[in-house]
Amino acid sequence: MNENVIALDGPAGSGKSTVARQIAERIGFNYLDTGAFYRALTLYLFRLHGNSPNTESFADWVKTSEAERSLSDIRILCEFSAGKENRIFLNGEEVSLAIRTPEITREIKHIANRRIYRNFVNQELHSLAKLHKLIIDGRDIGTEVFPDAKFKFYLTASSKVRAERRFLQLQEQGIEADRDEIEKEIILRDKSDMEREIAPLYQANDAILIDTDILSKNSVISKILKILDR
């Protein structure tokens, strides 16, 4: 049983990241954003593809041996910061902001859906877990990456509630958005995550289900902390 890892899985917008960061700060663990690793990997490959003379689309190129061989040239480092976003470095360059662009968000699915790239990221995560106590959020942390984690939680909420949260978040950032369109995107993302062939989203048999529809953020945090204290 792995006592260095607390796994938080669930669909997009269920509150995993916010909850994970605050719990990590309270119990002295480090919060690890697995999505940042996939984004950094996507950024590296996207740049490599853009600088190559090939005419293949990015989606097709990442399936080639040229793209897969480039994994040996990639070094992704994570700098932890209590209660804040991880700082991510790609081959020595800080890319914490560069990995959050709409372009990378759009292309990341081509990386996350391929086993060789998931294995690369998972290996990085396991290396970190040997050195640090981590609370990790994602889609398959408790089912595939760390199935031996001592504590596993699955956070969920209705698509309507998750869309409202995202809408308010965008408003705070001064970005105009449509609630209905956001909900449609969330529903499509759920379908894609749950039906993908590799590492689909589902609740682990031994994960504790928490419905964040009916609980405030502080209530969710309190509930998880009580379970961790048992």
From Swiss-Prot:
Database matches in Gene3D superfamilies: P-loop containing nucleotide triphosphate hydrolases
UniProt-annotated location(s): Cytoplasm
Stored Pfam families: Cytidylate_kin
Annotated InterPro entries: Cytidylate_kin (IPR003136), Cytidylate_kinase_dom (IPR011994), P-loop_NTPase (IPR027417)
Matches recorded under CDD domains: CMPK
Sample GO molecular function, one term: ATP binding
Signal peptide span: none
Superkingdom in the source lineage: Bacteria
Family: Belongs to the cytidylate kinase family. Type 1 subfamily.
HAMAP family the record matches: Cytidyl_kinase_type1 (MF_00238)
UniProt-recorded name of the protein: Cytidylate kinase
Species per Swiss-Prot/TrEMBL record: Leptospira borgpetersenii serovar Hardjo-bovis (strain JB197)
Protein encoded by which gene: cmk
